[in-house]
Amino acid sequence: MKKKVPAYNGTLRDHTIMCPYCISECSGIRIFGKRIKSIAFSTDVAIIKNINADAIIAVYPFTPQAAISQSIISISDVPVFVGVGGGLTGGKRSVRLALQAEHQGAYGVVVNAPIADEVITEIKQVVDIPVIATIASVHTDVRRKLEAGADILNVS
């Protein structure tokens, strides 16, 4: 028997972007005790405040900046996974950004597809949040990303 969940939408927030209901049937993933079934891919704070996703993945095609991560984390009512580079930005800078993101309250950090496996390993040595490795090609050696320390894969 399907559960009937009481709901309140209000008048002013009745235009929320709703994730498809079928997502509620998924098992999801549990991170730090919180089950996450839906993840919205956005850096738009208006979208982030008005979507019913369980989490946000915030990556963008510019050099990652702590101020941007902090803004998104502070505006969000749900866990945020923030980008820490891996393309033009990499190496020690990505490691420092990952540590700073953890201190800001990020639930995890996302590394871009071209990141060196050694940088994933370095990030894992300094943070206690998941490292999410972006996979953008069927030619990516997924096993090496996982062996380097990636906890979750973002296939895009």
Where does each model-flagged region fall?
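Alpha/beta enzyme core
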Residues: 1-156
